[in-house]
Amino acid sequence: MNTLVVDAHVRIGQHREAALSVEALLAAMDRTGVDRAVVAPSEAQIAYDNRAGNAATTQAARATGGRLVAYAVANPWRGAAALDELAWAHEQGARALAVDSALQGFDLLDGLVDPLVRFAAEHRWPVYVRTGTPPGHLPLPTAALARRFPEVAFVMGRSGATDFWIDAAPALRHAPNLYGDTSYAPWDTVLGEFARDPEIGTSRLVFSSDQPYATAVGEMRRMRDWLLPAHERAAVLGTTMAGLLGLEKEPPA
């Protein structure tokens, strides 16, 4: 049986320094053997125009028959309106929450995002938190947030890349419901450390290309070069993320 490959985080649309259309993403997935990808909207839509962003991701999911899976976004500064936005996105088919506290302008531990995480918990959504921007948008604060919500699966986006990789393993040890993503991380150092750590292991890692900031070919090549037992490779490449999302084990036709 072929290994199911799920890309845990991609951003579609026009960004400040890059862009990725749905068509270009699907072509990249075909070239690299990715079955499904979880898509977040553009930077501006994450920060401000949440409705346009949620419409973009959920429409992409419907148009591809579920090959693309939608993240929902809402700026927590909007208060009750942010929860209404997540409810709308849920009705449209979103299956996870994406948070970028640097873009959205809040501290992970100031309580502002907590109502959104509670919404995710109620709907059994995993929560992606992009990390790597100092001073507050980092692995250890993400782990502290995850500890507040042990019933929620958190994905530590970029695993602190690149200056804060040193904090990624301690963060994963601190919060057992936190998962690292593989984007940018060398397999022979960062990912190898995760895999060898008895408190982490490959079952706590999910593959992410983080397009359009990284390339699908480069990220997948590093995964293919990483020598892992077949069952561990399958978990990293797709089955763990599929489980967090509640997806079927086989990709859609």
Task: Give names to the regions the model predicted.
Residues 1-8, 19-36, 202-204, 217-253:
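Mid-to-C-terminal alpha-helical segments outside catalytic/metal-binding sites
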Residues 5-8, 38-41, 71-73, 98, ...:
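Active-site neighborhood of phospho(di)ester-bond hydrolases with catalytic His/Asp-centered motifs
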Residues 5-13, 131:
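Histidine-centered catalytic micro-motifs
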Residues 9, 29, 57, 61, ...:
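Conserved, mostly hydrophobic/aromatic
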Residues 13-15, 44-47, 76-80, 104, ...:
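Active-site environment of divalent metal-dependent phosphoester hydrolases
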Residues 24-28, 53-60, 85-89, 112-116, ...:
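A general structural detector for well-ordered alpha-helical segments in enzyme core domains, enriched
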Residues 35-36, 44, 48-126, 174, ...:
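Active-site gating/metal-coordination segments in enzymes
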Residues 96, 109-206:
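Catalytic pocket-lining loop regions of alpha/beta-barrel enzymes
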